[in-house]
């Protein structure tokens, strides 16, 4: 059996509404039904039911407002691509080590020494570069940085890391 879970909260920019789904794939319908029953009981016992506004929003977006949603979504995808392309190019140009990145909200700097990562994270904060410390790296939210501010960010980060590494 294969299960695929997704969140509508981020996809439909409905943060906090907690709307999502789990899709089950199996060759045996009985297995799917049994798993669906278990998941339904577990989800209801853990989170109760989603609120009506989340359900209404989902239905509205995928029916009446689908074309507008897809158009708006494409706009944000383009913005994210522009921001990440700038950051990735500048990171490569200055030698800032990052984990492989395909797409998404975050680029993660690769810093395997966790003590150094903690120092770097703190230094970033001192320079008003707000990041999230993660295991063996630092997460940069390119989704929250405007295009003008993302320009030069990788170099600033690399310079800070170099100062701490000396």
Annotated model-derived regions:
Residues 60-64, 86, 90-94, 123, ...:
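Alpha-helical structural signal in soluble globular domains
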Residues 23, 108-110, 141-143:
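Short hydrophobic/aromatic beta-strand micro-patches
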Residues 114-166:
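PLP-dependent enzyme catalytic core of the Aspartate aminotransferase-like
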Residues 1-77:
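Conserved core segment of the aminotransferase class I/II
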Residues 59, 72-88, 97-110, 133-136:
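Conserved glycine-rich beta-strand-loop-beta hairpin in the small C-terminal domain of fold type I
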Residues 52-55, 84-85, 118:
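Short, surface-exposed alpha-helical segments at coil->helix boundaries
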């Amino acid at each position: 059996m294969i299960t695929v879970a997704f969140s509508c909260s981020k996809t439909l920019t409905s943060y906090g509404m907690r709307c999502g789904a789990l899709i089950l794939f199996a060759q045996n319908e009985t297995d799917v039904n049994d798993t669906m029953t278990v998941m339904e009981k577990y989800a209801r016992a853990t989170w109760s039911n989603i609120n009506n506004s989340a359900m209404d929003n989902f239905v509205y977006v995928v029916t009446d407002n689908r074309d507008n949603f897809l158009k708006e979504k494409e706009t944000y995808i383009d913005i994210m691509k522009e921001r990440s392309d700038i950051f990735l190019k500048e990171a490569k140009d200055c030698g800032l080590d990052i984990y492989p990145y395909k797409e998404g909200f975050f680029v993660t700097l690769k810093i395997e020494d966790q003590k150094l990562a903690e120092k770097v994270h703190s230094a970033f904060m001192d320079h008003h570069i707000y990041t999230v410390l993660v295991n063996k790296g630092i997460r940069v939210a390119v989704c929250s940085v405007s295009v003008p501010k993302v320009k030069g960010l990788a170099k600033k980060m690399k310079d800070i890391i170099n100062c701490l590494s000396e």
